[in-house]
């Protein structure tokens, strides 16, 4: 793995030079730190692999071993800075999903060089048409980010409470053991009973003692119930969404002129698929099942078994006359 990490220009490898630091730019090709200083001494230059104009201040340490992944991540970050609309800005969920699909298409085209010029013009046109919306969404914190921050804040508070509770319990237990030891010594000194009775009585009293209770300090809240310092506040009303008719699945019926094929459960119980080749692991991963092949063969075998031309002759003649 260390031999694969090499500079394409000077051929230095991580194996021969453990301190080798590979840098990557927007084009996705890597260069070592020494080559970057030599080629981009004036602040700008071209990539030796693809001749793309680059700037020296845009080089950064490579995070992924695959250069394509590094390039795609960089493109995604740049595109999402401009294509930053949220779901609340769309009247319907379908419009938002189409918007996300358009973003993925743009990222794919830029990363793979497909329709590069047309995609760049499309991005530039979007920036011009949505300049105000882009700046507004950049300044406004999205609800998802605020929700994550709220979760992190709550998680930190819970961890702090558990830590305080554990420290309190340890202190109380240590002090209680010290007091019990002193009380036992006093009883042994001043009591007239035998030492065995004193120790047994003391042990019974210790077991009956209740565990110390840790009381959390009350959190400061407003009259509305909002916590002080809670960062997430929804200051904008949601855009009313269009009511859409829910999709209802209706199974289609086909006229096969034959007996109906068995159901999927009957294929296993009645052993229809006994002599069907089982699906391979690759086929199962792709959604294939041996029941599909068995059911298709049965449907083809049963189709047309109950078709009698004499019964359908008049129907076929009338349909042909209407067509003519």
UniProtKB/Swiss-Prot annotation:
Record InterPro entries: Cdk-activating_kinase_MAT1_cen (IPR015877), MAT1/Tfb3 (IPR004575), Znf_RING (IPR001841), Znf_RING/FYVE/PHD (IPR013083), Znf_RING_CS (IPR017907)
UniProt GO MF annotations: cyclin-dependent protein serine/threonine kinase activator activity; zinc ion binding
Keyword presence, Metal-binding: yes
Alphabetically ordered keywords of this record: Cell cycle, Cell division, Metal-binding, Nucleus, Zinc, Zinc-finger
An example Gene Ontology biological process: nucleotide-excision repair
Zinc finger (RING-type): 7-51
GO cellular component, one term: transcription factor TFIIH holo complex
Coiled coil segments of this chain: none
CDD domains the UniProt entry points to: RING-HC_MAT1
Location (main, coarse): nucleus
Cell location: Nucleus
UniProt cross-references to Pfam families, sorted A to Z: MAT1, zf-C3HC4_5
Keyword Nucleus carried by entry: yes
Function description: Stabilizes the cyclin H-CDK7 complex to form a functional CDK-activating kinase (CAK) enzymatic complex.
NCBIfam families linked: cdk7
PANTHER family tied to this protein: CDK-ACTIVATING KINASE ASSEMBLY FACTOR MAT1
Subunit structure: Associates with CDK7 and cyclin H.
Protein name: CDK-activating kinase assembly factor MAT1
Phylogenetic lineage: Eukaryota, Metazoa, Echinodermata, Eleutherozoa, Asterozoa
